[in-house]
Structures are given as C-alpha cells and as structure tokens.
Swiss-Prot record:
The lineage of its organism: Bacteria, Pseudomonadati, Campylobacterota, Epsilonproteobacteria, Campylobacterales. Pfam families: CTP_transf_3. This is 3-deoxy-manno-octulosonate cytidylyltransferase. PANTHER family: 3-DEOXY-MANNO-OCTULOSONATE CYTIDYLYLTRANSFERASE, 3-DEOXY-MANNO-OCTULOSONATE CYTIDYLYLTRANSFERASE, MITOCHONDRIAL. Activates KDO (a required 8-carbon sugar) for incorporation into bacterial lipopolysaccharide in Gram-negative bacteria. The gene is kdsB. It is an enzyme of class 2 (transferase).
Length: 244
C-alpha cells in the first residue's frame, strides 16, 4: 500500500501540491506514478485536494488538519483503512512529481525482504549520490551510513565533512529522498514516539527514529527526482516536463 500525505497549506510554498504541471495537478502526477507500483491512497487535510484526486480516478481520504507531520497524517489514514500490522506501507511525498515507479518498487521490495529477516529494520528509505554543489543546498537532506547500510545521521548540512580532501579528491554525498517504507505496526510506533531535540533542530522527523535507537535501512537508487519546495523548483519542473 502506498500512502501520499497531501497538506494544502505548505509553509514554504502554499498550495504547491495543486499547482499544475502542463495542465495536471502535481499531486495527481505523483499519485499516477505511484499507482503503477501498488494500491495508492492520497491522505489530505483539504476537501479540495480530495475532490481533485477523485476527479482523476485516485482514491483519497480526508484527514485531520492538526497533524504535525506527513507521517502522522498517513498513520491516521492507515487506521482509517484498517491496514494490518504486517503490511508494508510506503510514504511517498506529494511534491515529487519525477519520482520513478521503479524507485518506489525497489524500496517496497527491500522492505518486504528485510521485514522477514532476523533483525528487521524499523523503517527504510532511499538516497542518491549528489555532488558537492548539490549538497550545499539545505533543502536537500544528506545522510551518512554505517557498515550495514543503515542511517547514522541525517542533516541539512553537507555531511560527512571531507577534512583532508584536495582539488583532485572525488567528493560525493548521499542525498536523501523523501520516500519511506514501514510496516503497519512500525508506522504507528513511530508516531507514538516523542520528538527529539535533534529532530527539532534540523526539522527532520526521521531523526526521531534514530534518537530513540531505531534502525533506518537505506538503499541507493538512481533517480532524477527532486522535491518541489519553492516556486523556482516548480519552474524547473515545468521546463523538464516541457522538454520531455
């Protein structure tokens, strides 16, 4: 099951999820791609968004306006839908219209496989390799991993710090994608955790899981996806869709 949180009043770019890209609302483009992988439901605090989705043949449900995060929103949706504790649930962000179905499918398969192991992760997510220039953008979250491909830390700052690098050192960073996989039970458990100081400092809710000692398994993917966080990002998206 894929759940897409869709808050209409985004702080940085209000109403971005209903902005049209070549005549199609962004949230519809995201959901249509997700539907190529699994059953998909949009969870929104806005009746307008719900009606837009349903008009385009996408299942959508109305959720509370009081949620602090998209994860809290999809947790409510999972309860409304009565999803079982063992079911793998993917959280796909409603502002990533370029996220390829193959990437979503890869994370789903990895979480399904890992959840059957001896030491299943609490949740899973994905990253792509990015350049030093890309890593300097605080809107692009970076992640560093342990030797078992689990996240050690996420930050808006460029991490790791390459102390002894030279001009010839091939620097690279891991850019986090806004894509998560849980089981039904781990999703509800995550939302029951108290927030952590690091989460509040970085404004990154995934740090809540790490702060409480939970594992986040990471997979590397190749993608051209990026989040639409500003009007400038939307202009970039319009150009890419126009050229494709």
């Amino acid at each position: 099951m894929i759940l897409i949180p869709a808050r209409l009043a985004s702080t940085r770019f209000p109403r971005k999820i209903v902005q049209e890209i070549l005549g199609i609302p962004m949230i519809v483009r995201v959901a249509k791609r997700a539907m190529e992988v699994d059953s998909t439901v949009v969870a929104s605090d806005s009746l307008e968004v719900v009606e837009i989705c349903r008009h385009h043949g996408i299942e959508a449900i109305l959720t509370s306006k009081d949620h602090a995060s998209g994860t809290d929103r999809i947790a409510e949706a999972a309860r409304i839908l009565e999803l079982p504790p063992h079911e793998v649930i993917l959280n796909v962000q409603g502002d990533e219209p370029f996220l390829e179905p193959e990437v979503i499918a890869s994370l789903k398969e990895k979480m399904q496989e890992a959840s059957l192991g001896d030491s299943p992760p609490f949740m899973a997510s994905a990253y792509k390799k990015v350049s030093q220039e890309e890593a300097s953008d605080p809107n692009l979250v970076k992640v560093v991993l342990d030797n078992h491909s689990c996240a050690l830390y996420f930050s808006r700052s460029p991490i790791p710090f390459w102390r002894d690098c030279t001009e010839s050192t091939p620097l690279f960073y891991r850019g986090h994608l806004g894509l998560y996989a849980y089981t039904g039970s781990s999703l509800q458990a995550f939302c029951a955790l108290p927030s952590s100081p690091l989460e509040e400092i970085e404004k990154l809710e995934q740090l809540r899981a790490l702060s409480h000692g939970h594992k986040i398994l990471m997979i590397e993917v190749e993608t051209r996806s990026f989040g639409i966080d500003t009007p400038q990002d939307l202009n970039r998206a319009l150009k890419i869709f126009g050229d494709s």
